[in-house]
Amino acid sequence: MASMQKRLQKELLALQNDPPAGMTLNERSVQNTITEWFIDMEGAQGTVYEGEKFQLLFKFSSRYPFESPQVMFTGENIPVHPHVYSNGHICLSILTEDWSPALSVQSVCLSIISMLSSCKEKRRPPDNSFYVKTCNKNPKKTKWWYHDDTC
């Protein structure tokens, strides 16, 4: 537990001091607990999400960094994207099978920024309706099938 807290403190400091472009840690979210962070995000300039505001929720288990955080979009504005379900779940391989303890909150944020920035057309995943009706509340409990190599 102590190593997890130490790692999260280090990553929290890095995120506060040098956040990825368009991302801001919601400081109030970490006042009571180190294991749940809200990160505010703005769509990058020149993308289909330019100027839109989103919020990410990161939840860390006691096994972090050996286990990936639970990451999902939350709030009223969930991006319409081929790899983002309308309930906020994100189909991104580094959040599951491609996770490595060498990755960090910063690297997850950069991957999400890149995923959104490369989108050319706003649309939901083809199985959105079925998935949202049948999925677990925790996206980490989903057995993801990556339909393409851009997840």
From Swiss-Prot:
Boundaries of every UBC core domain copy: 3-151
GO CC terms: nucleus
Keywords tagged on the record: ATP-binding, DNA damage, DNA repair, Nucleotide-binding, Nucleus, Transferase, Ubl conjugation pathway
InterPro entries: Ub_conjugating_enzyme, UBQ-conjugat_E2_core, UBQ-conjugating_enzyme/RWD
Active site as annotated: 91
Reactions mediated catalytically: S-ubiquitinyl-[E1 ubiquitin-activating enzyme]-L-cysteine + [E2 ubiquitin-conjugating enzyme]-L-cysteine = [E1 ubiquitin-activating enzyme]-L-cysteine + S-ubiquitinyl-[E2 ubiquitin-conjugating enzyme]-L-cysteine; S-ubiquitinyl-[E1 ubiquitin-activating enzyme]-L-cysteine + [acceptor protein]-N-terminal-amino acid = [E1 ubiquitin-activating enzyme]-L-cysteine + N-terminal-ubiquitinyl-[acceptor protein]
Record-level GO BP terms: cellular response to misfolded protein; DNA repair; proteasome-mediated ubiquitin-dependent protein catabolic process; protein monoubiquitination; protein polyubiquitination; protein quality control for misfolded or incompletely synthesized proteins
EC number: 2.3.2.25, 2.3.2.23
Subcellular location(s) per record: Nucleus
GO MF annotation terms: ATP binding; ubiquitin conjugating enzyme activity; ubiquitin-protein transferase activity
Domain of life: Eukaryota
Keyword Phosphoprotein: no
SUPFAM superfamilies in the record: UBC-like
Pathway(s) annotated for this protein in UniProt: Protein modification; protein ubiquitination
Main location (coarse class): nucleus
A Pfam family recorded for this sequence: UQ_con
Keyword check for Protein biosynthesis: no
Protein family (similarity comment): Belongs to the ubiquitin-conjugating enzyme family.
Function summary: Accepts ubiquitin from the E1 complex and catalyzes its covalent attachment to other proteins. Catalyzes monoubiquitination. Involved in degradation of misfolded chaperone substrate and DNA repair.
Protein name stated in the entry: Probable ubiquitin-conjugating enzyme E2 W-A
Native species: Danio rerio (Zebrafish)
Gene name for this UniProt entry: ube2wa
